[in-house]
Each structure stands twice: as structure tokens, then as C-alpha cells.
């Protein structure tokens, strides 16, 4: 009789138990691991799977997390190059791909990452045909479209992390100016995650008080307080962080865990995430852009119809045209 048998009396043998709330992170770079630790610390999964092509790094990251098991409430952390480890995932987060270099635009990464997605997506779909896909790799709007095309999933199950982080950055900067917690500062950035994102100045408020009604020049060129600069800082923030530390990780990891929480707990919170916007705001092509979406267990269940000023709508359309110009040239 082994020590284990002497110590423990078996009551019931489970038949092939598999996780009920499994999350997979594809790509264990700085962003993937920031997503992983943020998800672990929010107790969102009963199993976490990590996948990457770099086997040593992958095993090292898995072991490092497993060694912290005592301090976490996710009983199973697995990893592998083979996508079989991802089977039965409820949510699959894709962070793999070529990374933005200093000064490089997100759009420049496109074809490099399309080729990577051609391998990843079919493997994810094979083992978790009912999962929700959350795309984080840049350029996120285009790669969410690519993931949708390759997966064959209905559009409500393919979500791009989109402007969830841009809006969070905006609210942080707004909070700094007003000396108010960002949770109480409301403002939305929509459109492309990146250089052509659109700040919806008309909706910016604190406690339901429209800031533009108090300060009509807000967001305009002639504004003495130069609020436009807040949006400029949002656009430049990733470039600044990349210049200083080489990559971004913590904020996007926290932002992704925020989205994962809404999905896994069926919270039906509204987030600015990338979804198919054809037919909205005069957009006629199969473009993915961020608009306010209700998220829950089945993915994106609803879209909030924003009231946009004509110039905001024009910017959104222009964003869509830019993205479609690139999407229609892609080689699948």
C-alpha cells in the first residue's frame, strides 16, 4: 500500500473530467503572460492553457505560474505546442504574432500576422469549436476580421480587444486632469484601435454632466484647455511605452482580463470592442471596428447605437475605408 493509499480513501472516480471554465492564451510573450496573470488573479478560470511555438519559454512560463499555485485559485495550469491542450476552452485569447517595433504602425504588421493566424485559428477551432475568440494581436481590427474569416465562427463569437484599452487610457488621463477616479470619468473611444481612433467628445461626462455642454470647445482645435491633447496622448501612449520599455504589457493584460471577466461571468457590461460594423454608421463593407458592445457568455449579444456628430461619423467611415483598403488585399 502506497503512502497516498494509506492517507486517502477513494470515494468516487471521475470519468474524463474536463474543465467547466477553461481559458486558453495563445502566445506567451509579454502581452500573453500579462493576460495570463491578470486572469489568474481574477479567478476567472478553473483551467488555464498556454500555447506557443517556443517550447522552452512556454514550459518555463507554465512552471513559474504553477509554482504560485498556492496563491491562486486556478487548480490546473497546462501548456503545450500541440493545440490538444486547449480542448474544451470557453474563451481563447490570441496574443501571438509579430510585435510592433519602435515607431512601426500597427497596420504595418498585417501580412506577417495573417500568416501566423492561418496556422493558429484552424487549430483552435478544431479543439474548441464552441469557444469565443478574443483577438489581441495587432493590428487588432484587421486580425479580428481575419480570425472571423478563417474560423467560420458567427460574428458574435469573434471579439477584438479593440478600443477597450484606448478608452481606459482616455479615462485615466481625464481623471488625472479632473482629479477624479477614472471609474467616475466617462468617455468612449471608438473606431480603429490605433492612430485613427475616434474620441466621442459629445458623450464625455462626469456624473451625467456633459463636459462639452460646460465647455463647448472641448475636442476642437481652438480649445484653450486643449482637451484634444488627451486623445493625442491616448494615440501616442503605446508608442511612448514601447520607446521606454520595449513593449506594452500590463495595461493590455488588465484590459483583456476585464473583457474575459465580462464574458466568463455573463455580466452584460458594455465595452468598446471590435466587431463587425457593416450596416452601422453608413459602413458598407465587412469591417471590424470598435463600437460599444454588450458582452456576455455567448460573446457579443448587442451593440449600443451611438449618437455621433457628423464629423465623428465621418472619422469612423474614414477608419473603415482605411481598414477595408487593407483587408481586401489580404492573402488567405
Swiss-Prot record:
Amino acids binding substrate: 106, 138, 169, 248
Annotated SUPFAM superfamilies: LDH C-terminal domain-like, NAD(P)-binding Rossmann-fold domains
E.C. code: 1.1.1.27
Catalyzed reaction equations: (S)-lactate + NAD(+) = pyruvate + NADH + H(+)
Listed GO CC annotations: cytoplasm
Catalytic residues, chain numbering: 193 (proton acceptor)
Disulfide bonds: none
CDD domains the UniProt entry points to: LDH_1
Protein's cellular compartments: Cytoplasm
GO MF entry, a single one: L-lactate dehydrogenase activity
GO biological process, one term: lactate metabolic process
Metabolic or biological pathway, per its Swiss-Prot or TrEMBL entry: Fermentation; pyruvate fermentation to lactate; (S)-lactate from pyruvate: step 1/1
Keyword annotations of the record: Cytoplasm, NAD, Oxidoreductase
Keyword check for rRNA-binding: no
Domain of life (superkingdom): Eukaryota
Residues given in the record as NAD(+) binding sites: 29-57, 99, 138
Primary enzyme class: oxidoreductase
Cross-referenced HAMAP family: Lactate_dehydrog
Assigned protein family: Belongs to the LDH/MDH superfamily. LDH family.
Record's function text: Interconverts simultaneously and stereospecifically pyruvate and lactate with concomitant interconversion of NADH and NAD(+).
Subunit note: Homotetramer.
Protein name, per record: L-lactate dehydrogenase A chain
Name of the gene: LDHA
Amino acid at each position: 500500500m502506497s503512502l497516498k493509499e494509506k492517507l486517502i480513501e477513494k470515494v468516487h472516480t471521475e470519468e474524463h473530467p474536463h474543465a467547466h471554465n477553461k481559458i486558453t492564451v495563445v502566445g506567451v510573450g509579454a502581452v500573453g503572460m500579462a493576460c495570463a496573470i491578470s486572469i489568474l488573479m481574477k479567478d476567472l478560470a478553473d483551467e488555464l492553457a498556454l500555447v506557443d511555438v517556443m517550447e522552452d519559454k512556454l514550459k518555463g512560463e507554465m512552471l513559474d505560474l504553477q509554482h504560485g499555485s498556492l496563491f491562486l485559485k486556478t487548480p490546473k495550469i497546462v501548456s503545450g505546442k500541440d493545440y490538444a491542450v486547449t480542448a474544451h476552452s470557453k474563451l481563447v485569447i490570441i496574443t501571438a504574432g509579430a510585435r510592433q517595433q519602435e515607431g512601426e504602425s500597427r497596420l504595418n504588421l498585417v501580412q506577417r500576422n495573417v500568416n501566423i493566424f492561418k496556422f493558429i485559428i484552424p487549430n483552435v477551432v478544431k479543439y474548441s469549436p464552441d469557444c469565443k475568440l478574443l483577438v489581441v494581436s495587432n493590428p487588432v481590427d484587421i486580425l479580428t476580421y481575419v480570425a472571423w474569416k478563417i474560423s467560420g465562427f458567427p460574428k458574435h463569437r469573434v471579439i477584438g480587444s479593440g478600443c477597450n484599452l484606448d478608452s481606459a487610457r482616455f479615462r485615466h488621463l481625464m481623471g488625472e486632469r479632473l482629479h477624479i477616479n477614472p471609474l467616475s470619468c466617462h468617455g468612449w473611444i471608438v473606431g480603429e484601435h490605433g492612430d485613427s481612433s475616434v474620441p466621442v467628445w459629445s458623450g464625455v461626462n462626469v456624473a451625467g454632466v456633459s463636459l462639452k455642454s460646460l465647455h463647448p470647445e472641448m475636442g476642437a482645435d481652438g480649445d484653450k484647455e486643449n482637451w484634444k491633447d488627451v486623445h493625442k496622448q491616448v494615440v501616442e501612449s503605446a508608442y511612448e511605452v514601447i520607446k521606454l520599455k520595449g513593449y506594452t504589457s500590463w495595461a493590455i493584460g488588465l484590459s483583456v482580463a476585464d473583457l474575459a471577466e465580462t464574458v466568463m461571468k455573463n455580466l452584460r457590461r458594455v465595452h468598446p470592442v471590435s466587431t463587425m460594423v457593416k450596416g452601422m454608421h453608413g459602413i458598407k463593407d465587412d469591417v471590424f471596428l470598435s463600437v460599444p458592445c454588450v458582452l456576455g457568455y455567448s460573446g457579443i449579444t448587442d451593440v449600443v447605437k451611438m449618437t455621433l456628430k457628423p464629423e465623428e461619423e465621418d472619422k469612423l467611415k474614414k477608419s473603415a475605408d482605411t481598414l477595408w483598403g487593407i483587408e481586401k488585399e489580404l492573402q488567405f
